[in-house]
């Protein structure tokens, strides 16, 4: 895939993710149990903090810096997610929704600014994009769709 195709793939997966919760009332968005104890609001926050991580680590990767492992920094991905869940718990649904949209816009703007040659297949740069965007969103979209089907 070239740069434009990668961005289109990110945006398609993003739209599908948002479609999964489209039409939910605010009280449904904060109801726990969608994915473990997490609500849709929590899943939105989760996706957004991983996009924040993407914005931190993609520039490092392009500079040849290997980001430290989450196991070293936090004791693992689950520990990082728990820490971020606690950090984001103080935000209202509206604040989370605003942050989600702002962060995603920054991701797209950043990707558009990166030269085409950095999007080569198999690179650490491309793998990080996959892990934090179009490989990540569908997993949580499915959780939301499954929950909606189960609770309807």
Model-derived regions, located:
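Short amphipathic alpha-helical segments with heptad-repeat character
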Residues: 7, 11, 44, 48, ...
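A short secondary-structure junction motif
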Residues: 17-20, 24-27, 110, 114-117, ...
